[in-house]
């Protein structure tokens, strides 16, 4: 039986203890993007949200938001556990570990933000505890969480696990992000919708990073295996946001939401280097203004003016990485 080729990304080397020299400029550039876009929960103003929560939303909308936030609050903890217990020790390249270090920090901030939103909106202690324990108490959340957690154990290859967590961050969040942006179109819940902009941008970057690492692997999965993982995630997300927690509660069309999830999945497959499964167009043209892809308008139209000044100069300026400039001249 032929031996498997060595994976440079996963092979222990003393170089991992020192940041320079950079071996993967694309990974380094992703790290600098993550560094440039750091934010904190204190930057999000929730003062208007309480008024909207009490006076502008109906019971169905409140139910939807509560359960979406409950899923988000739990899922970030699962992503964190995978990063801390698996990916940080799997990957042996210092610039990739640097990215994961920032991802761990920002996932903690996402978790804090979602918990703060629930704490702000839900006054009843018993209901709030029920939502914070959604993995145990809410079946539709538990199903998504169980799918994500099964990829943390040691039985699958790194390639399979990185595809699965690209699905968690690229597909499992897509319907919920889209629904919250729908509320933004209506001018409701500015704190929730602003934090959603920040978090969806971050998750897009994390998904892009997973795709980049996958493309750098020497041994990739069969197209059939990748599509099996992606389509499984699509069905679970579709069930969650179309049936178990129907997007109709916030006035969105079920069939169009299902199509949107398929569109997101096809885009992910393309980023991984595979063909489309669904071949559908984006039914929500207004989502193109937001886009879950981390690269989209990242520096031109950053939301909330929170990109840290000068951080990208080492990549975009006259430094060591001139050949890897992130151009602002292209049309995204």
From Swiss-Prot:
UniProt note on tissues of expression: Expressed in roots, cauline and rosette leaves, stems and flowers.
Enzyme active site: 114
Gene knockout outcome: Embryo lethality when homozygous.
Entry-linked Pfam families: Ribonuc_red_sm
One of the GO BP terms on file: programmed cell death
UniProt-annotated location(s): Cytoplasm; Nucleus
Note: 'TSO' means 'ugly' in Chinese.
Assembly: Homodimer and heterodimer with RNR2A. Heterotetramer of two R1 and two R2 chains. Interacts with CSN7 (via C-terminal tail).
Family of this protein: Belongs to the ribonucleoside diphosphate reductase small chain family.
Role noted for this protein: Provides the precursors necessary for DNA synthesis. Catalyzes the biosynthesis of deoxyribonucleotides from the corresponding ribonucleotides. Involved in DNA damage repair and programmed cell death inhibition.
Protein name: Ribonucleoside-diphosphate reductase small chain C
Encoding gene (name): TSO2
